[in-house]
Amino acid sequence: RDFVAVLRFQGPRANGMPELHKLTPILGLQQDKGFKVALVTDGRMSGASGKVPAAIHLHPEALLGGPLSRIETGDLIRVDPAKGRVEVLNVDLTGRTPALGPVRTNLSSLGMNMFAPQRDIATDAESGASTLGELDVTK
């Protein structure tokens, strides 16, 4: 079945922006069966993951109340790579309550706990996902 996979809470502050390339083979299998699939996320994927159309690094990230935090199961989503657009059809997202992000007390891995302070101060993807403050990415 055709679908858009929405993977939120993968941005710099929520989850440290992990590499999501392992999704490509799974989504690619659906493409191989003739389905149209795409991925929309506030996370990141390597350039080697180009088989599946993907809108990545969306900001503000879901944890900060970005648009992905308001998308619900069943929403119709159009991904237009040529125009660089993601649209949620027939829905006013501003009227929805943002979904809650992961609860930090449930983090079980050493890495997630150890790097929590860095995630708390990270800038958004548009600003470089830096823990050193705002970076001028235009230079």
What is the role of each PLM region?
Residues R1-K139:
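Feature captures the catalytic cores and cofactor-binding loops of soluble hydro-lyases/lyases
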